Every structure is written in C-alpha cells, then in structure tokens.
Amino acid sequence: VTGAAGLDAALAAIAAGRMAVIAGDRLRGGDIDLMIAAEAVTPEAINFMATHGRGLICLSVTPERAAQLGLTLVNPGTERQTGRPFARSIEAAHGVSTGISAADRAHTVRVAIAPGASNADIHSPGHVFPLIAQSGGVLTRASACEASIDLARLAGAGDAAVICSIMRDDGEMARLEDIGDLIAAHGLAVAEIGELIARLERADA
C-alpha cells in the first residue's frame, strides 16, 4: 500500500514502535530506507536493519539535538546534494563493549537521544552514524533523513529516527519494486516522501 493510505499505515506503525519503509528520496536517486523512531529502537530492530537493509545504519537528529551533542557536519556544503548530512560517527561513552553489536548500537542511540545528553556521553569515532537534518524537514530537503524525523514527529514518537538504506541481493541499491517480498513478509508500511510533502503542505496552507 502506497499513497495516502501507505502514509497513514506507516504513521500508525511508527507510533506503535514498529518499522516502516521510506520511499522516494529525491537526493539519492530514489533509494529506499527502513526507518524506526529512535525512541523505539531495540537490538532486534538494529539486527533487522543490518540483515534486511544491509546499508549504513544512521541516526537522524535535529540541528538542536546535534548542537546539544556537540556534533557538526563532517563536510559542510555537500549534504544538500547527497541527502546524507553526516556528522562524525559516535559511540556511547559507557555501557558498550566493541560498539558494533546490535545491542551496543541500540544503546548508543538511546544515549544520544536522552533528554539531558551531551558530548560527554558519547565518544568518536563509533558505529552509529548521525545525520543532521535541515530545520524545515522535507519541505526544505526531500530526503529520508528529514522524512524520518517528520514521520516520527507526526506519529508522536519523538524527533529522532534510525534509518538504513536497503540493498538488493546483488549489492545494488533497492527500489520499491525490489522489496515486495520483504514488505509482505514483515507487514511493512511504505511512506512516500512525495505524499509526506503534500500532507505537510496542506497542513501549512
């Protein structure tokens, strides 16, 4: 299910702490991502992304959260073209072992989004890759980073999200038509960025 119904289903899933698919990233040639609200992240969710997404697992944060953590863009000026506004990779300062396990990465996410978190709570480099979103969300930049935060907010699930690009079995980036079996097997709802933009524009009108 796509379109408005898909967006509604995705918002319901996110509100319930489940995963959804983001489609239609305009800055990355239509790449698609798995997404879960950061406040709902678990080791099982990280493992699902690593197993079925196979791309880089990233933490989408607002500029305000990034500033709170002392994070800045690694390569300012390129993020508008790439749709991947990377800050330096992070690890929780305490409570992890090697940092790369699903449990360790989930812990790092929880530490980074805690209300009182600061730069003292994280170390770099690490195994979680923060993305710093544009303040205006998808109305400013139509990428999965901004979409994931907008979706979390609309779902009442905070203002941070974990996303992971989906690769095909042959290593190429997947398109929506490539993951029908994955969507069906796991009951994943699809939020299209174009539909999200249209809804937010109507809300602003």
Model-derived features: positions:
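Catalytic domains of riboflavin
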Residues: 1-205
